Structure formats: structure tokens, C-alpha cells
Amino acid sequence: MFLPADKSDEVDLAKTYDAIVVGSGAGGGMAAHVLTSHGMQVLLLEAGKKLNINQELKSMEWPYDHPRRGDMPPDSHALSGREYTIRQPPYAQASPYKHVYSYIEDGNGSDYAKDIVVDEKDHPYTGTPYAWVRARCLGGKTNIWGRLALRLSDCDFKAASRDGFGEDWPISYADISPYYDKVDLYLGISGHKENLPYLPDSLFQRAVRLNPAEVKLRESLAKTGRVLTPYRAGVTTDGLKHNKYRVHCYGRGACDRRVGGCDIHAAFDSPTGLIYPALETGNLTLRTNATVAEVTVDKDTGKASGVSFIDTDTGKSYTAKGRSVLLAASTLESARLLLLSKSSLYPNGIGNSSGHVGHNFCEHLMGPGVYGLNKELVGKPRTLDDGRPGSFYVPRYRNLTDRSSKFLRGYGFEGGSGAGMFPDNAYSTPGFGSSYKKTVRDYGGAFIGMGGFGEVLPRYENYVELDPDVKDRWGVPVLRFHIKFGDNEKKMAADMADSAREMFEDAGIQVLSVTREILTEGYSIHELGTARMGSDPKKSVVNQFQQSHDVKNLLVVDGSTHVSASCQNPTWTIMALCWRSCDHLAEELKKGNV
């Protein structure tokens, strides 16, 4: 494993960079990679600190080797799922704890990511209930993401033409497919080809192996025309010869018992996958602890002239200059930054002549699912499943050819079975001593479960705005949420639960429980759509190359620009779109068109 020396530099405030990139996650890291490969001088600004992820995650460490077995220290608290439903944000207000973190920290190994996610006391927000998971450190949430790497298809890009709701994307699968290929080859992805038109295959490396329970469910689903495929993980299983910072997956870590992350970097993360290689070009300047508070504007040309940022340690403000500005701060933070960037030229926020910034929010609903037992596997030899980066995925099957009368769009399932370090039945099994241990071992690998991820429709009335009164620790106005699931999501959730039960029963799996409750808005961490792309400047914020309709040298290259959520996880699409947009920007800058 090679880790680079600290190459982060102080920003040359007298210099005009070819591009300033705000945020270092999936979109920001990809922008840094692509633009530096074009020979451009790039400034990358990250609001959080640079962490040694190897020391933070410790996936090879036994729980008993860590203080409190990985649980939070006494002065810290992770919000529970129930707290999001019975309280209103800001959730840390009046809390007796010194530090308050999002729900992602609630569970085994919660102490392992406390330096990655934000302290809610420093970063409040207001409005409707919303489970907002934020990471402020180099690489952002890619340090702890769930690793499911899926493509979208024309079933998603042209969904509005199919069912009449919302807007089509201004691109087709043919436009983005070559860039999906580039992401696959550069970062690595494991999976199995299924030849599904609605879930295109990637250029896969070796797939995760299904265990006997999962094979049984796969064979049962095939009889009804449904598919269970090995988890399509953004993980290199065969290795990458072009990247010295990452090694191939050994299946040895604690992928299933941490909040996420991979300290050998087999799973993609932005620092080792994109930023460290970009630093080696000599074209990238990295500045951490830099919270961007405004996109600055040239009053004569109306173009973006750079950004102003706050040093998160000292509170001092600085201004950096750039020929172009790319926002990749995350869907909600990028919308916040656009709204914060008000001027006489852009009184409603930069790039917001349409009034759509912050609106058309969409994501994935979570909660409904099923949990069961394969009786024939009780007492059978256990499989090693704790180190798999994922187990299986059941792609969408609703509203593909026949239209459901109940709801629009569709959903998929993520699931898994097998033996882990913490068997599912360990807490609920009665008894003590050797007989108790034997029962836990005998049943530990026989359980199987899966949970749904459903498409949340983009609606103008689901939006965020700046709170006029509440500010964060650095005096920057925070977001106020106006986001609620609608009837379509509720009907979809009911079908999710019923369908999940049916699939398990048909496979001969004993159903132990069915979950019908929808988790709080935001729980999926797949927020999308607050600066959507489109061909009509009156109904969208950016064009097909994620370029502002109003300010041609301003781009938004994160999930903000997604027109709809589909039911597939968005990370791979964010990076493919960003690569495409950055190639276009580099060419336009060379031509003098930006």
C-alpha cells in the first residue's frame, strides 16, 4: 500500500486557476481527475479535514481491541431512527450531549466514523423531518458509501415519456454509456452480466459469490422472470494496475459490520481512486478545511470569477479566482451554495433565473422489506460472508412493460444472507453457555433478508430554501427543508412489502417478519435533483453538460442535476456525468467559448 505524502498546498490567492472544484466526493474527485488529465490547473476545495482513513476505519480490528467495542464515548450521541420521526430539526438543539451525529453512527462500530460525518451541533438545519447524513472530510461520503454501483437506462432517462410524469432527461443512455465504461475501467466494479435492458451491464471484474441461500432465492425468482444478481459493487476484485493506492478485495474486512468504508481501498473512495492520482500530475492544488460560502461574480461579464471560502479552523475568509467553477458539494449543499450566492446580477441566487434551484428534490424511499429463515440450512457448515462488499441485488420489475394501476415507477431490493461476526439471532436467542452458543452457530447462517429502494418522484413542492434566522457555527445560513413523501411513495412502499413476502414464500423461505414502515425522508442518503438539467432554461438549472443556463462557466457536477431518481443507486451515474461534462468543459475552454 502506497500513501502519498501530504501534497496539499496553500492556495495561491493571486493566481487564476483554470477551474475551482468545490467538494471532494464522487463528483469533486472525478472533476479533479478529469480536468488535471487535460492539463488544467485545478484548485480543489474541501470543507472538512484530511483524514488517515486507514486509521479511522480499522476494518481488520476485532471489536474487543477498541475502546467500548466501537461504541460512542459517553459525551456523544448518534440519532436513532425514531428520533427523526418524533422530533423536528434541528435535532441537536437542547441535546445534553457534547456531540450529536446522524443515524449512520448508530450501530456496531459507531465510533469508527465519528471524524467523517458532521457534528449536528455545528451543522444544524430546520424545517420538516429529514435524516441528513453529511460527511466533511477529504473524499466525503465515498469513505463510507454502501458500494452498490448501478447504471441507469433509457427506462430512467425517458421515464416521463413513458408514464407522463415530470420531465425527461436531456440525454439518453447512448450519450452516457461510454463514460460509464470509463468509470468501470478506471475505478473497478464487480458483478455478473444479466443482459437486462433496464439495468445495463458494466465492464465487470470478478463477481461476489452468492451463498446457498441466495442461490435458492435466485432460482426461485427466475421462474417468475425476475432476477437476483450478485451485488454490483464499486470494488476492484481483480486489482487495478494503473493505481498504486488500491489493492484488490480479499474478502477479509468488516464490510458488513461497519458504517462502510474500506481501509485497503479495494472499494472505491475518492481520495485513493481519484484525488491522489490527480495530485501526482502536478496540476492539482488541494485545500482542506475550506468551507465555500459564495460563488463570486464578475459584474462586467456576469460570469463566475471564483469563490469565497472560510477556513474552518480560524474562521478567516479568503477569495480564490478561477476561469471556471464546478460545484460538487452534494445535492443539498450545492443548492445551498447557489442560493447563498446572491448579487445585483443574481438576486435569487446564482444560476437561479428559473426559480428551480432547491426544487424538484427526489431520492429513494427505504424501510419496507422481509426477513426469513432457510430451515434446511440450520446446522449446516457456515460460509464466510462477513468480508463480502455486498450480497445480492434484485432489479426493478414493476412498470417495465405493463403499467401498474397503483403507482408510477419502480423499486429494487438489496439483501443478503450468511454468517457474520454478529449472527442475527445472537441477541434474541434464549439460553446461556454451550447450548446457547451452539444454537446461535447452527442458525447463524440460515437467515436471509432484503430491503427495498424505491423511486421518489421529483416534485417542485419538495424543496429546500435558506433559513432566514438560523446559521451554522461559521455564521452561514442553513437550509430549511420542505420535503415529504407523497401518495405514490406510500402505495409503492405497500407493494414493496407485499411483494417481498411473496418472493420469500414462493422460494420456501420461512417469513419471520415483514417491515412496512417507511423510514424518514433522507434515510437513503441518495438526495438528488435540486439543480436539475434540462433543455428549457425556464424549467431547469443546467444543460446536458451540467453547465448553468445563466452562467456559462459555472457547472454543477453532483447529484443536484439528476432529473429523476430512478431506483438505482446514483454514485456511478454522478461520476459518469461528471466525466462527460469535464471533457466538454476542457474543450470549450480551449476554444474560448467559456
Predicted regions and their residues:
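Conserved redox-cofactor binding core of oxidoreductases
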Residues: 68-131, 136, 141-151, 156, ...
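N-terminal Rossmann-like FAD-binding beta1-loop-alpha1 element of flavoenzymes
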Residues: 19-44
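Glycine-rich loop(s) and the adjacent beta-strand/alpha-helix scaffold that form part
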Residues: 37, 41, 47-72, 281, ...
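FAD cofactor-binding and catalytic pocket of flavoenzymes
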Residues: 101-141, 169-173, 354-479, 487, ...
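A conserved FAD-binding loop/helix module that cradles the flavin
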Residues: 564-583
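Residue-level detector of alpha-helix initiation sites
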Residues: 25-26, 332, 561
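A glycine-rich dinucleotide-binding beta-alpha-beta segment and adjacent secondary-structure elements
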Residues: 230-237, 246-255, 293-296, 445-456, ...
